[in-house]
Amino acid sequence: MLGNPSEGSETEPLVDTRIDFPESDRIVAVTVRRVPESEAYPDGVKYAMHYGTRAGETILRYDNAHPEEKGHERHTPDGTTEIDFPGWEVLLARFRTEVMEHERDTGSTE
């Protein structure tokens, strides 16, 4: 399972996981951290959900790494698009689905 939600405080991640797909040479790294609500992080959450190759190529990434400038984004090899933020749990479920579909479609067994 990709990233099990857990209770946490502002200093602990809600999700912090890494998964290797050795047969496809791809990785997943997910971090969701509670942060103080602010203008930059009105939802009180900072996150990065990355799926890519070990060589550093991005296949899929969701993040809010630059909230003052960009907000919530979806990154793929085709470019970056702004997205509506449905909440981190919903976004994590979407990310899980997309990763597993990609792994299945590219012949990975995990």
Predicted segments, located by residue:
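The feature represents the first ordered module of a protein
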Residues: 2-72
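Generic alpha-helix signal with a bias toward terminal, lower-confidence helices
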Residues: 31, 42-44, 71-74, 95-103, ...
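Short helix/strand-capping connector loops at secondary-structure junctions
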Residues: 69-83
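Short, compact, well-ordered microdomains
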Residues: 79-110
